[in-house]
């Protein structure tokens, strides 16, 4: 796991090497080396361990996702802001099964740092609304559900929001 700035330095050094290959008229080598530099740039914006954790989470393998996230030792140094948001988002989702208080902390931090996609932000707010509901904070849960409904433009979370509203009537 490289620091985020080291990834950019490596990408720039590889790009300089590719330019040298172009100058030496080794065009195919230069193109191949540029593709290699592109991988480092891609991993600057999309962290490889977070991508692998998402894949494990899609398979409902929480232990595998936790293992991949464990490789990120210092998220502040290794990840850009949005990736830190997703790092906390993934931790919050995994902890919501076992420790609600800890999950709430991670999900709030993820919302504060920001998530790239609106449906991820809506899901985080819906999770927070569920946690607030279990802790008998009805007003906060209602506000979070309203925010999640605004963010859910494609209607992917419509059923979950309806279920939570039905449960809230019982409180």
What positions do the PLM features span?
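Structural motif corresponding to the intra-repeat A-B loop/turn of tetratricopeptide repeats
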Residues: 59, 97-98, 134-135, 168
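Amphipathic alpha-helical segments of tetratricopeptide repeats
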Residues: 70-75, 108-114, 146-152, 156
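Residue signature of alpha-solenoid helical repeat architecture, marking inter-repeat boundaries
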Residues: 43, 80-84, 118-121, 159
